[in-house]
Design a protein with these regions (language model features):
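A structural signal for short, well-ordered beta-strand segments
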Residues: 11, 64, 80-82
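Conserved Nudix-box catalytic region and its N-terminal flanking loop in Nudix hydrolases
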Residues: 15-53, 148-158
């Protein structure tokens, strides 16, 4: 069997006011920036490229949030946190509008169920990695686990 997985990256990008970068996608409405990893790219290269293409800004990746998988289409999404470092908010073919929003406003604007679930994980995942699997239509979470990130105090490194 030939592998057929697609891998994407996305980020919760924040500014100095702790506002969240949102793009208005013609396909899914309001969401955080991200997209598919192109052949030969690293996770970091893909994420920085996607944010630049969709929002016109530069970022520094600051953390890992988690992974989710569409069990119906073999799509894997990897989520990160990032800090805005420069550039002007600029719409593109992939984003009709680009804004900074408070976390509360972001939760209100995002209506696509998968995007909202991932944002909840991004906002609450301090020190944990979120791993979940879902089916898209209707959106149903089939597995949802939050695991501590990194080594824990009860794990020996010797």
């Amino acid at each position: 069997m030939t592998p057929t997985h697609f891998v994407s990256v996305a980020a919760l990008v924040t500014n100095e006011k702790d506002e969240i970068l949102l793009v208005n996608s013609p396909w899914r409405g309001w969401e955080y920036p991200g997209g598919l990893i192109e052949p030969g790219e690293t996770f970091q290269e893909a994420l920085k490229r996607e944010v630049r293409e969709e929002a016109g800004v530069e970022i520094e990746i600051t953390g890992f949030v988690g992974i989710c998988k569409n069990v119906g289409k073999d799509i894997v999404n990897i989520d990160f946190t990032a800090q805005y470092v420069g550039g002007e908010l600029t719409p593109s073919e992939e984003s009709t509008e680009v804004i900074w929003a408070t976390p509360e406003k972001a939760m209100e604007l995002i209506t696509f169920p998968l995007t909202k679930k991932r944002l909840q994980n991004m906002l609450s995942g301090r020190g944990e990695a979120a791993l979940f699997c879902f089916r898209r239509e209707p959106f149903t979470v089939v597995e949802d686990v939050h695991l501590p990130a990194g080594l824990q105090d009860n794990v020996s490194t010797a």
